[in-house]
Amino acid sequence: FSVDENVLIPRQDTETLVERVLRDYPEKDLKLLDMCTGSGCIAISLAVLGGYQNVTAVDISEAALRVAKKNARRLFLIQKGTARSESFQVSEDPWCIRLKTWLAKGPRLQAEIEEHSLTLLQSNLFQAVEADVMYDVIVSNPPYIPSAVIDGLEPEVRDHEPRLALDGSEDGLYFYRVLALECSKHLNKGGCVYFEIGYDQAEAVSRILTIAGYREIEVIKDEPGLDRVVKARWNR
């Protein structure tokens, strides 16, 4: 994946989330949302590897969405079209992706993948997500580093990755609290959330989800054996 100073560098940790969703949902008839998409690595990987029917990727940063669009084009798509309306098509089967970008209509990027689709949407969390739109799965790798810790991070992270994508507020849990509440409004009954977490946040995030009404909470470890993803189901 291409990256710049506007997005996080994709890490092996995030593969844990992608691999688990692919394992849990082999069926293609799935509506999925990736909140805080950044470079688009999660959403694009799930759209292509999972072949899912409908994937939406959301980020507050217009610059980040430009990177995600670039990745969609560079990794999977060949470009056709005019200055006002671009279309993209995957050059290899079986995906046959045709992606149309409506440049004159704001930040929404609509990709048509035959019966599947990929959408990039600029939004401050769920603000621009229509209230009646529901999903089967919502995934997120939100900012989760406590504010006071950021200045002590490795220079390659602190100085070259956007603070917007790192800073999880005072205790690092701000976005999990918001997501736990907002995701429940957009999940179909029985739908699941998958949140990437810091290695020491599993208990706190699990508690947040429990209080918000989620059930079947599971902590998933990454390859080195560290807590990396929390999965939970919404049954209301």
Predicted segments with their positions:
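Residue-level signal for the nucleotide or nucleotide-sugar donor/cofactor binding architecture
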Residues: 8-12, 63, 67, 140, ...
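Conserved SAM/SAH cofactor-binding pocket of Class I
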Residues: 16-84, 93-95, 99-102, 106-109, ...
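C-terminal beta-strand of the catalytic ATP-binding
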Residues: 144, 233-236
